[in-house]
């Protein structure tokens, strides 16, 4: 048994809310195992970037619009309780795609990268395939391993406090909790006795939150 998964790119020029809602409805109608969703990135030198420069295409950077499109796509995907948010950029059908290799990698397990652009680590050695002729290897420090795990578990909408206590030391946990309290006040996170759970808006800003909290904790530790 296999899984059929799709990538959905949103926030392209002149895209309407109806477009992202229709994309979500198609994914559900076809019972696709999972949909990864990403805001459009315009790469320098691409045809789109040249068309924008030549003013053939109008492309406005509007974070409110980006979030509005994201929110409507997610809301439609979750309507009916057939799908759930599996990871910051992936919504999966219940009983479908389990994203096992990402779960292994993000919790500190060994994953050996093969294709160009792939990255992973094996027994504390980081590996990155830069191109078909060159690979980059690095020895991971104890801090790098632990904070990579922290970044990894923050790729998921529910962050287990037990997992955090297995990664962070007592003082680091205190600083982490300080930042989570700040996020909760902003409506990005909800806390209970066992977990921190990202809200829909928190998932949208998830990678920013992850980077922000890691920098905050490390600055508190090293800048005493």
Predicted regions and their residues:
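Structural signal for well-ordered, non-membrane alpha-helices
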Residues: 74-78, 184, 210
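Basic, amphipathic "hinge/linker" alpha-helix immediately C-terminal to the N-terminal HTH DNA-binding motif
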Residues: 145, 198-203
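Short amphipathic alpha-helical interaction segments
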Residues: 169-184
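Short, amphipathic alpha-helical interaction segments positioned at domain boundaries
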Residues: 203-224
